Amino acid sequence: METFEKASILSRSLDQFAEDLDIPEGKFLEAKKRYESVGAWLGKDESPLSVYTPEIYPQGSFSLGTVIKPITNKDEYDVDLVCFLAGLKKETTSQAELKTMVGDRLKANETYKKLLDQEGRRCWTLNYANEFHMDILPAITDDALRAQGGLLSHALLITDIQKIADKDPEWPKSNPRGYVLWFKSRQESVFLALRKRLAESVKASVDEIPEYRVKTP
């Protein structure tokens, strides 16, 4: 019984610690609203990008639900985003052209123009003072990898400012959605293992351990 109580106290302490580190729901929703607004601007009917049906979606910690609070008040939340343009092919466009297309559309909005940082190596960055900054990564489909199916069906080709402006057949690759799916599948097995370990530590059956008490890394 004493062992279970100690485990319970430790679990509550860890839960509180994780909650203190986590991004507040209000901030999360605010960031989501802002990047959805960016996506709406990129895809407006009058936008030159509208024919490519721009899609903005999060990648990295924001897509995995692992965003943590900035260390100090001077730091900001980092929101990594993909700007996917459908229909564009590496055979008919260059990385420089893709990067410029997205950047020009952002600059056409007076608000975003003021928020834009200097062009990054792979991203366009919008700086929301004392809140967060959004790194927007232009991307197109990686047809060769997607043809292999599975997690690779989400593969992307991305831009790199260090690449030449010509239609280089070798593009940097990325697969944020595939990674999220892989991560979640791995978490399922980790969850089951942690639940079993917790049950063993308190000499209880697995079914006696509530799911909410199991915190995956």
Positions of PLM-derived features:
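Nucleotidyltransferase catalytic cores
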Residues: 1-18, 50, 162-217
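N-terminal regions immediately upstream of nucleotidyltransferase
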Residues: 1-76, 87-97, 123-126
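Weak global preference for isoleucine
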Residues: 4, 9, 23, 56, ...
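Alpha-helical structural motif
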Residues: 34, 98, 213-217
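Conserved catalytic core of two-metal-ion nucleotidyltransferases
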Residues: 42-46, 64, 96-183, 189-191
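A structural signal for short, well-ordered beta-strand segments
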Residues: 79-81, 136
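Long, well-ordered hydrophobic secondary-structure segments characteristic of membrane-embedded
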Residues: 82-86
